[in-house]
Every structure is written in C-alpha cells, then in structure tokens.
C-alpha cells in the first residue's frame, strides 16, 4: 500500500517508480531489485491513449538504462511475480509495442514472469481478481523486451506473448536456464543458449533469424501447439544447435 511504502525510502508498490531509483551496478556489486508476488503493470492497460514511438522507434513501456541490474522475484514459482503489459501493433499502439527496453551488460532476471498479454489471457492464481482477459483475439506483434548488452542471464523466468514475443532480444550473449516460453513466429532470441527450457510453439517459425551468432538448445522440450503439418525453427538461414531435446505433439 502507499501507506507502507511511504515509511521506507527504497520500498515501492510500482515497478516503474522503483526504476527511477535504479543506479548503475557493477559485476561485483550489482543493482539488486527484489520483487514481491503481485501483478505489476509496466504500462497501464486501461489508459485509452494509443502509444506512439519516438524518433522513428517502436513505442516502449519502460526504458531501463542500468548495467548489472538483477531483478529477482521473491518466490520459487515465477507465476507469482508478473511484469505485464497489454499492447501491440494496431492494438493500443502504433508500431510493435515493446514492454521493456533494457540497456547495459550483466542483466539478470530470476523467478518471475515477463508477459505481453495483448493476445493472451493473464491468469494469476494467487489472486484471481488480478487476472485480465487479452486485449484482442487477433494476433499482432506484441513484444516483451529488447536488451542491449552482453552477459545476460534469465533463470526460472516465464516469457509470454504470441507474435514477435522477443524475450530479451538483442543481447550479445544470453543464457536461458529453466525458462518457459510461449510464442508464435519471429519470437525467440537468436543469440541465446536455452538450457533445460520448455517452449510452446503456437506458430511454425519461432525464430526470425539466428545469424548473429547462433542459438543453442540443450536438454529442452518443444511443444507444438498448432495444427500445421510441419514445424520449422527459422524463417531465415542461420546456425542452430539442438542437443538432447524432445518434441511433443
């Protein structure tokens, strides 16, 4: 509540307000942010104003410039801490709305969910009334996050959207460990190592490209959740390694 947060200088009930207090971390002393279970809207889904980007870029929910930022959910179940938005191309935004635009090396996210619920229902078992229906059923480009940096780690994180999901796309090198992802096409990070992950494919081509360095899947599970007769990985040509993984239809 506002009453509780007012007592403490570094306790917030809004992620966006907390972000104003972020200071640059280092590899030895990262900027650590602990997030209690709840649904935190990075962009107000009830605001009728259409989001428009600046300087020719897509519209962003929140731009975060903070090296060695560590976001940690205070739970072992990532469904209990949700960073959410609900906008996409022509659906509350002009351009491919992107919830986060992170800048800086050493970003780490753990034990939480990042979701753009423009075309997916948000379900929050801890407090059902915090759930929300999708904005529209017609699937459009609705991004989760861009990341401009190196040595990025996501552990026990759920990434939720459909078209162009973008789980921290743009990272030079990124490890996804024990993560869960839902998407259709043009969605996954082409420079990622996916270790012990679960991915649900609602489209035939989850990658747009992987030629920036190549993606690697290790001991991961792929669930094909569409009715097309074939499943691919990429629209474009690029390196891809799949080791000890399983397909489920």
Predicted regions and their residues:
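Sequence-level preference for short, compositionally simple segments enriched
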Residues: 1-249
């Amino acid at each position: 509540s506002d009453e509780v947060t007012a007592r403490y200088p570094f306790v917030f009930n809004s992620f966006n307000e907390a972000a104003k207090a972020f200071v640059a971390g280092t590899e030895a002393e990262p900027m650590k942010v602990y997030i209690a279970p709840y649904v935190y809207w990075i962009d107000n889904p009830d605001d009728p104003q259409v989001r428009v980007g600046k300087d020719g870029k897509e519209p962003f929910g929140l731009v975060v410039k903070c090296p060695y930022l560590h976001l940690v959910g205070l739970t072992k179940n990532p469904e209990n801490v949700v960073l959410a938005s609900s906008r996409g191309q022509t659906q509350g935004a002009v351009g491919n709305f992107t919830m986060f635009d992170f800048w800086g090396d050493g970003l780490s996210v753990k034990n939480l969910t990042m979701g753009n619920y423009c075309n997916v229902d948000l379900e929050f078992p801890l407090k059902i009334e915090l759930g929300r229906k999708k904005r529209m059923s017609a699937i459009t480009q609705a991004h989760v996050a861009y990341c401009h940096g190196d040595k990025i780690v996501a552990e026990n994180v759920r990434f939720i959207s459909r078209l162009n999901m973008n789980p921290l796309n743009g990272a030079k090198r990124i490890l996804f460990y024990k993560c869960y992802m839902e998407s259709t096409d043009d969605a996954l990070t082409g420079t990622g190592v996916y270790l012990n992950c679960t991915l649900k494919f609602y489209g035939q081509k989850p990658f747009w490209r992987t030629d920036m360095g190549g993606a690697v899947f290790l001991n991961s599970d792929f669930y094909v959740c569409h009715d097309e007769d074939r499943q691919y990985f990429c629209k474009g040509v690029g390196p891809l390694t799949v080791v000890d993984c399983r397909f489920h239809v």
